[in-house]
């Protein structure tokens, strides 16, 4: 875990016109009653996850997520669903709450499909699960860092 780069070191530079998508996905540790929510922020242009936290669905967890969003991305136009925590924490004029039918969080939803395809612990009806929070976090971070580095490599090839 210590050999993984920091998430911010896997990111492409922010641009003023970047658009962010916020969303969360359900998982559990050991038993389904031990719910964990993966909160993520995706940059639409780069398709990279710029911040994530694992916790409950509270306003406090949303605040933790906001604190992890790099400064250079905080001014960006952003979209989330109507979950109350987003409305309380993301109160800047660049944030918009939208329904799934708007398509404004479709890239984030698509990324969750990729996550579920590669990480069985995020599949809704599964026999795979983490036994400890630390393992759950480690595997998730590993997947996100690998995803971001792959996107960064792809961007360098197209320049």
Predicted regions, residues:
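Residue-level recognition of single "structural anchor" positions
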Residues: 1-159
